[in-house]
Amino acid sequence: GQVFPQAALEWLQAHGALVRLGQRVQSLGAAPQGSGWLVDGVPFDAVLLATPSTEAARLVSQCAHTAPYTWTVALCDWAASAQALRFEAITTVYLQAVPGAGGRTLPLPMLALRSSPQAPAQFVFDRGMLGGPSGLLAFVASASQGEREHITQQVLAQARTQLGLVQAEPVQTVVEKRATFACTPGLQRPTAQVAPGL
């Protein structure tokens, strides 16, 4: 949701940062003598590159042309590793259940579940305990595979078997196909810092 982005935005603005939202960056380059960065030609001391990996790879590849010579190989390597990332889906299945005493459906706001190929959800969140509608549960299946309806039915069976929620009914299923990158053995992950100030 909006909890973390809004808090980050407010903190940045309170500390004097210029935040521009809803603008696609066309170009990113190193300022002369590595004295900062040029975003669409506008100079900045530092840049937080918060984009999908494919977009980050595009922008960092451009940087290699204007960056100090000593950064060129590192920038190209970073762009290649970002471009090579493969994605996996995260599916969230929302079920409406009958809340118990005190409006709670689960004993805690979040529970870990036993997942398997037939029971794909790893976690469940009681949205009612987190400020949402009473009885609304969000089951999260990371690295999910398969059709939306099939996953929904698997999670519904998992809720009934593992949590005893026999009266739970599906409300909505959201599949974010590129939600995360695949954490595979030997993965060459791009580093958090691309170059000084980036």
Regions found by a protein language model. Name each.
Residues 12-25:
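A conserved beta-strand/loop element that lines the FAD pocket in flavoprotein oxidoreductases
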Residues 23-150, 157-163, 190-191, 195:
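Mid-domain catalytic core of redox enzymes
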Residues 1-15, 142:
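Helix-loop-beta segment of a Rossmann-like dinucleotide-binding subdomain
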Residues 1, 11, 37, 96, ...:
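Tryptophan-centered motif/residue detector
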Residues 20-21, 164-177:
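A short coil-to-beta-strand element that immediately follows conserved catalytic motifs
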Residues 176-198:
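FAD-binding beta-loop-beta segment adjacent to the flavin cofactor pocket
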Residues 2-6, 54, 153:
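A structural signal for well-ordered alpha-helical segments within the folded catalytic domains
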Residues 8, 28, 47, 111, ...:
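Generic beta-strand hydrophobic packing signal
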